[in-house]
Regions:
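A structural signal for alpha-helix termini and helix-coil/disorder junctions
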Residues: 17, 40, 73-77
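C-terminal binding/interaction regions
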Residues: 9-12, 58-82
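Amphipathic, hydrophobic secondary-structure cores in small proteins
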Residues: 19-56, 61
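An acidic intrinsically disordered interaction segment
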Residues: 1-25, 81
Length: 82
C-alpha cells in the first residue's frame, strides 16, 4: 500500500468516510490543473470547495469537470480582466 493510499484510508477512517468514495485520480488531476492553470495556492482551496459542493449533492465528476474547464481558461480570463 502506498503512502497516499495509507493516508487516504486513515483520513477516511478518522472522518467516518467510505474510502471507496475518495476518487484520488479525479481530485489529484483537478488540483494539478488548478495549480498549473491558476496558482499553486489555489489548488487546496479548490479541492475544499469542490468537496463542499459534492457534500451538497453535486457529483464529483461534474464539479471537477466544471472547475478544470474554468482553470484551463483562467489565463485567458485574467488577461481580459475578467
Amino acid at each position: 500500500m502506498s503512502t497516499m493510499d495509507q493516508w487516504t484510508a486513515t483520513v477516511c477512517a478518522d472522518l467516518g468516510l467510505d474510502p471507496s468514495s475518495a476518487d484520488l485520480r479525479t481530485v489529484l488531476d483537478l488540483t494539478r490543473d488548478v495549480a498549473h492553470g491558476v496558482a499553486r495556492p489555489a489548488a487546496p482551496l479548490t479541492a475544499y470547495l469542490v468537496g463542499v459542493a459534492v457534500g451538497r449533492g453535486l457529483a464529483l465528476p461534474d464539479a471537477a469537470g466544471r472547475i478544470a474547464a474554468l482553470a484551463a481558461g483562467w489565463g485567458e480570463r485574467s488577461e481580459e480582466g475578467a
